[in-house]
């Protein structure tokens, strides 16, 4: 191997030195996602006629939430105002820590269920059916509003971490995403 050492820089300063795996883990674990930061703070791309006031994932405004092992519905709520009538769909992508997409949840895109939002105040609510068994681990979320195949109206990449409690196998060991996959 050509490279055996890794260095992580922050604001022009060395923040961490170590081997490649440790450096990568340090970089990925020190993302700007603090539990006291709101999901709406991660909205970086949005349509100029769209003004968001509140975003909730799993009934929380903050970017970290827990999914207990007996939870089977994941809720998403987006509130705000629009200056024009808008056709939209909510897309939620669930990813691993390193950015590998595990699932994309977008009913409008897959089933043609596009919402028509009239000009003015709106409150979009989506309930997503979770698998019966969800493995233990963390899911990193990207949340988007879009008119499928037409335009992106809002993008919030890396806006939420879902800590999944997961279940246990027959021998009492936790079933983890890294070993067994998502579900």
Enumerate the language-model features and the residues they cover.
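Localized sequence-composition bias
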Residues: 1-183
């Amino acid at each position: 191997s050509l490279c055996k050492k890794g260095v992580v820089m922050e604001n022009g300063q060395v923040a961490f030195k170590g081997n490649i795996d440790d450096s990568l883990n340090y970089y990925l674990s020190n993302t700007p996602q603090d539990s006291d930061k709101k999901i709406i703070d991660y909205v970086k791309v949005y349509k100029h006629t769209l003004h968001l006031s509140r975003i909730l994932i799993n009934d929380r405004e903050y970017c970290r939430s827990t999914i207990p092992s007996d939870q089977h519905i994941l809720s998403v709520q987006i509130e705000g105002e629009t200056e024009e009538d808008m056709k939209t769909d909510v897309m939620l992508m669930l990813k691993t820590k390193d950015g590998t997409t595990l699932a994309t949840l977008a009913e409008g895109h897959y089933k043609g269920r596009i919402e028509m939002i009239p000009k003015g105040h709106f409150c979009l609510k989506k309930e997503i059916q979770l698998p019966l068994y969800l493995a233990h681990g963390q899911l990193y979320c990207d949340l988007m509003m879009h008119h499928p195949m037409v335009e992106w109206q809002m993008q919030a990449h890396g806006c939420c971490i879902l800590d999944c409690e997961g279940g246990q196998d027959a021998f009492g060991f936790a079933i983890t995403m890294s070993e067994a996959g998502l579900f």
